[in-house]
């Protein structure tokens, strides 16, 4: 109902089942009627949100978002969102009520960030902001997640880092160098390069994850990134990664003197490996300039594709949620094939190479 005050203003009161659920005052009757109609429609279709709920400042909502999700999501996911929202939300925007924030405000924020950051970094920030607004929708603070309406510009900021896989010769030379100078680390580097597992996934591998039937493989069930407790792999699902002859040989040898639940890889003290300790011990920046340990994963993927293994199979081995990610990342390295035939090709290639070098099995 609309009531005109003695001062000439129009007060709107909206009721639901006999209870006043909303009230607002306007200078013009037309504005009051428009607002009343929108509120009544929201009540009727079940999309009504108390306008007072949207008065919470964005900064306060972020605090609530972080507090409610702590321990309920993966630690790494929580840290990523917390960091993005803390570092990349302008203070001027953080002070405003969430209900006042528009798609234009968000587009301005993302566009400004694009000038100084790689598009992939801005995309991850957008994902964190979207998670925040989705949280606000679930808690009936706002009606919709407006972030979904904001598209990122192509960007002219920092160039995204391209993948830098090792060639087969570079990979083999690197492993030979490490076996000669730091043999305790050689198996780690070689398995990363042969299986394409992520660092955290390698750290979580146990003896019982090594399987022989129906073919040699490892079961990737968990990921234990540095500084975090074990969690599901990035895809959220267990996956089977077939082993070529060399990878199977290395892992069988490592499993021989261990118990079923022991880690396949650990440091000299029998504790979890740390990437920083490994790269420091190896002098990684000197022996592999311009490359990251993560590029060993790209190395495995590109060699698989060059061996004729089809994109869907490579995606499954890498633990990608869909083959579109694999296609986008390794577009220039693709051929075709699948599990057993793929491993047969890799083994045949390795055997031919050994024969060329005069090395017998």
What is the meaning of each model-derived region?
Residues 1-27:
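Short, Arg/Lys-rich segments that mark the N-terminal edge of DNA/RNA- and chromatin-recognition modules
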Residues 2, 215, 225-247, 257-259, ...:
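C-terminal secondary-structure termini that scaffold catalytic or DNA-interacting sites
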Residues 6, 149-155, 168, 173, ...:
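Conserved tyrosine-mediated DNA breakage-rejoining catalytic core shared by Y-recombinases
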Residues 8, 123-127, 138, 142-205, ...:
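Basic, Lys/Arg- and aromatic-enriched nucleic-acid-binding interface segment
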Residues 22-27, 63-141, 146, 160, ...:
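N-terminal core-binding DNA-recognition domain of tyrosine site-specific recombinases/integrases
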Residues 28, 224, 248, 318-343:
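Catalytic-site neighborhood detector that most strongly recognizes the C-terminal catalytic loop/helix
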Residues 176-186, 195, 241, 255-264, ...:
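Short, basic (Lys/Arg/His-rich) helix/loop patches that form interaction surfaces
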Residues 209-217, 309-329:
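Short, polar N-cap/turn motifs at the start of nucleic acid-interacting alpha helices
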């Amino acid at each position: 109902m609309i009531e005109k005050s003695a001062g000439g203003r129009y007060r709107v009161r909206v009721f639901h089942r006999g209870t006043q659920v909303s009230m607002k005052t306007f200078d013009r009757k037309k504005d009051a009627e428009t607002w009343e109609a929108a509120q009544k429609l929201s009540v009727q279709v079940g999309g009504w949100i108390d306008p007072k709920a949207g008065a919470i400042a964005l900064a306060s909502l972020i605090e609530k978002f972080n507090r409610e999700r702590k321990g309920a999501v993966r630690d790494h996911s929580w840290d990523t969102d917390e960091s993005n929202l803390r570092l990349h939300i302008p203070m001027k925007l953080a002070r405003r009520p969430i209900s006042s924030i528009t798609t234009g405000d968000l587009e301005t924020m993302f566009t400004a960030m694009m000038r100084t950051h790689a598009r992939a970094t801005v995309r991850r920030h957008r994902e964190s902001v979207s998670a925040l607004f989705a949280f606000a929708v679930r808690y009936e603070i706002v009606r919709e997640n407006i972030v979904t309406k904001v598209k990122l510009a192509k960007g002219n900021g920092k160039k995204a880092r391209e993948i830098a896989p090792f060639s087969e010769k570079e990979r083999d030379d690197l492993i030979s160098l490490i076996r000669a100078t730091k043999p305790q680390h050689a198996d780690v580097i070689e398995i990363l390069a042969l299986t394409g597992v992520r660092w955290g996934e390698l750290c979580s591998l146990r003896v019982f994850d090594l399987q022989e039937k129906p073919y040699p493989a490892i079961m990737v069930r968990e990921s234990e990134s540095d500084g975090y407790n074990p969690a599901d792999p990035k895809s959220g699902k267990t996956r089977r990664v077939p082993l070529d002859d060399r990878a199977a040989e290395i892992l069988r040898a490592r499993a021989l003197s261990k118990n079923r639940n022991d880690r396949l890889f650990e440091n000299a003290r029998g504790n979890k490996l740390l990437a920083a300790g490994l790269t420091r011990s190896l002098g990684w920046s000197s022996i592999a300039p311009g490359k990251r340990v993560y590029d060993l994963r790209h190395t495995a993927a590109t060699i698989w594709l060059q061996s004729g293994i089809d994109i869907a199979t490579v995606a499954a081995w890498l633990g990608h949620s869909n083959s579109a990610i694999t296609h986008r990342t390794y577009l220039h390295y693709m051929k075709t094939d699948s599990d057993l035939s793929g491993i047969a090709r890799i083994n045949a290639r390795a055997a031919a190479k050994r024969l060329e070098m005069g090395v017998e099995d």
